[in-house]
Curated annotation (Swiss-Prot):
Entry GO MF terms: NADH dehydrogenase (ubiquinone) activity; ubiquinone binding
One GO term of the biological process aspect: ATP synthesis coupled electron transport
Protein's recorded name: NADH-ubiquinone oxidoreductase chain 4
Transmembrane segments: 20-42, 61-81, 93-113, 114-134, 147-167, 197-217, 225-245, 258-278, 285-304, 309-331, 351-371, 393-413, 436-456
Predominant place of localization: mitochondrion
Keywords from the UniProt entry: Electron transport, Membrane, Mitochondrion, NAD, Respiratory chain, Translocase, Transmembrane, Transmembrane helix, Transport, Ubiquinone
Pfam families cross-referenced by the UniProt entry: Oxidored_q5_N, Proton_antipo_M
């Protein structure tokens, strides 16, 4: 763990000591080196699945893909932020990069933690840099409102979790993940036990977010700068799914009946958020609601508590992390040129930026889960599992996939086709930096098609 964690922490020092002219190239290169080193975690050499295990940190097949995604995202965020941060004073640029690096440090410690309390502390710590990024570097004054929503939803959701964890510590005597999975599971009999069960999962359902407690997400996404949107969509939402999988081990056996209403709500949320997407005019808002729908499917997969459900959820989390991050980058390239997030004002882009249209098409097709993408693999596993749980869910998941395809193609056609608007007189061409950014999103997606077992989670050890 330290071979990645120490260089990441040292990047903060590098940020403040680098010459101004070399700040962005140096940070991009160094963070890319750290991301490359993190790939060594993919090599399994233990029967138990746990690797580099010590008293507080370790990696296993579930956390490794998420850890690598976290490390991979830092150079991409730095690349994407260069254009709008370049005019800021030097110290602000350095503060911004330092916040991104500190966020990555907290995320590595959250995904790598073996103690659930350490995971909880890091889960809450990620809130601070994200909140500063949204409220300080957001575009409109509405960002303060978005920051308040984000703060209160997260804190109010996770306070019951802290109480539940302290109760568990008293009952079991330990909160170590490798130990808990081999211990006697707690029986849930009384109404108090059921409340304890809900408290354990509420924080993660808010973070995912489940439909019904999702209002903070579109606000935070729309108002955040590009780096904030990328890290929110790609990694922070996945903390919810990861936490649910970790804690659900100690919540069996009665969890199956308690999970029913949540599965129904998650599946209903897919249709509802899809319908909301069909009416959106704001590009970033559309992608944000799309994330809510996809994470609803992940929640349903986890709550079925079967190997297929867990595998499908892990695969979809990684695939969605790369896809939604890429879509936010594309939305940002449009925003930097037209200074508007309204889709209809940025139409006809295919004429001016034809190569960008290729990226738009590719990412939209990945978003609607076109074969042979990893998105499809994750969705099919979860849909098969929920169908096995109840045949009626097929109508909801099938309709959800259909609506996803409709709004993805609608987004593509609205932004890329049609007549150009008169107010767009001169638009700068696409930069090599932007194509590099999109290539670095697409490359893992394409490579994972060839070896998807790397992101199968617990099914692959």
């Amino acid at each position: 763990m330290l071979k990645v964690l120490m260089p990441t922490i040292m990047l903060i020092l590098t940020t403040w000591l680098t010459k101004p002219a070399w700040l962005w190239p140096t940070m991009t290169t160094n963070s890319l080196l750290v991301a490359t080193i993190s790939l060594t975690w993919l090599k399994w050499d233990s029967e138990s699945g746990w690797k580099s295990l010590n008293s507080s940190m370790a990696t296993d097949p579930l956390s490794t893909p998420l850890l690598i995604l976290t490390c991979w995202l830092l150079p991409l965020m730095i690349l994407a932020s260069q254009n709008h941060m370049f005019m800021e004073p030097l110290n602000r640029q350095r503060s911004f990069i330092s916040l991104l690096i500190s966020l990555q440090t907290f995320l590595i410690m959250a995904f790598g933690a073996t103690e659930i309390i350490l995971f909880y502390i890091m889960f809450e710590a990620t809130l601070i840099p994200t909140l500063i990024i949204i409220t300080r570097w957001g575009n409109q004054t509405e960002r303060l409102n978005a920051g308040t929503y984000f703060l209160f939803y997260t804190v109010m959701g996770s306070l019951p979790l802290l109480v539940a964890l302290l109760m568990t510590q008293n009952n079991l005597g330990t909160l170590s993940m490798p130990l808990i999975q081999h211990m006697y599971q707690m029986k849930l009999h009384t109404h108090g036990d059921m409340m304890w069960w809900t408290a354990c999962l509420l924080a993660f359902l808010v973070k995912m977010p489940l439909y019904g407690v999702h209002l903070w997400l579109p606000k935070a996404h729309v108002e955040a700068p590009i780096a904030g949107s990328m890290v929110l969509a790609a990694v922070l939402l996945k903390l919810g799914g990861y936490g649910m999988m970790r804690l659900i081990m100690m919540l069996a056996p009665m969890t199956k009946t308690l999970a029913y209403p949540f599965i129904i709500l998650a599946l209903w949320g897919i249709i509802m958020t899809g319908s909301i997407c069909l009416r959106q005019t704001d590009l970033k808002s559309l992608i944000a609601y799309s994330s809510v729908g996809h994470m609803g499917l992940v929640a349903a997969g986890i709550l079925t508590q079967t190997p297929w459900g867990f595998t499908g959820a892990t695969v979809l989390m990684i695939a969605h992390g790369l896809t939604s991050s890429a879509l936010f980058c594309l939305a940002n390239t449009n925003y930097e040129r037209t200074h508007s997030r309204t889709m209809i004002l940025a139409r006809g882009m295919q004429v001016i930026l034809p190569l960008m249209t290729f990226w738009w098409l590719m990412m939209n097709l990945a978003n609607l889960a076109l074969p042979p993408s990893t998105n499809l693999m994750g969705e099919l596993l979860i849909i098969t599992m929920t169908f096995n749980w109840s045949n009626w869910t097929l109508t909801m998941t099938g309709l959800g996939m259909l609506i996803t395809a409709i709004y993805s193609l609608h987004m593509f056609l609205t932004t890329q086709r049609g007549l150009m608007t008169n107010h767009i007189i001169s638009i700068e061409p696409s930069h090599t930096r932007e194509h590099l950014l999109m290539t670095m999103h697409a490359l893992p997606m394409l490579l994972l098609i060839l070896k998807p077992e790397l992101i199968w989670g617990w099914s692959y050890x």
